[in-house]
C-alpha cells in the first residue's frame, strides 16, 4: 500500500512541474503597465475595447492565452479583430519568465 502511494506521489509531481513554475508579481507589475491600457489598472476589463476582465482569472488560463498570442495561435485569423490587437501586446513579453511574472501580478489583483 505504501509503495502505491509513493508511486502516485511521484507521478503527481511529474505532472505538476509546469504548475510549480513561479512568476514574480513585482516584475509582472512593470509588464502590466502596457496591459492596463486596455484591461484597466485593476484588470477589470473594458467593454468598449472588448478587453475582458482578467483579474480573478485562473493563472493557467492566462498563461496559456498569452503563450498562444505570442506563438500566433491566437490573433492570426483575419476575422479575429480583437485578437489581432492583443497578439502584438503579448509579443512585448520577452520570454516565458515574463509571461509567468505578468500572470503572477494579475493574480494579485482582485
Residue map of PLM features:
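Axial heme c-ligation environment in periplasmic c-type cytochrome domains
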Residues: 47-55, 70-101, 106-110
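N-terminal signal peptide c-region/cleavage motif recognized by signal peptidases
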Residues: 16-18
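Bacterial N-terminal signal peptides that target proteins for export
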Residues: 1-8
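Sequence/structural segment immediately N-terminal to covalent heme-attachment motifs in c-type
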Residues: 22-44
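Charged catalytic carboxylate motif
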Residues: 27, 61, 98-101
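Sequence context surrounding c-type heme c attachment/ligation sites in exported
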Residues: 29-33, 56-59, 63
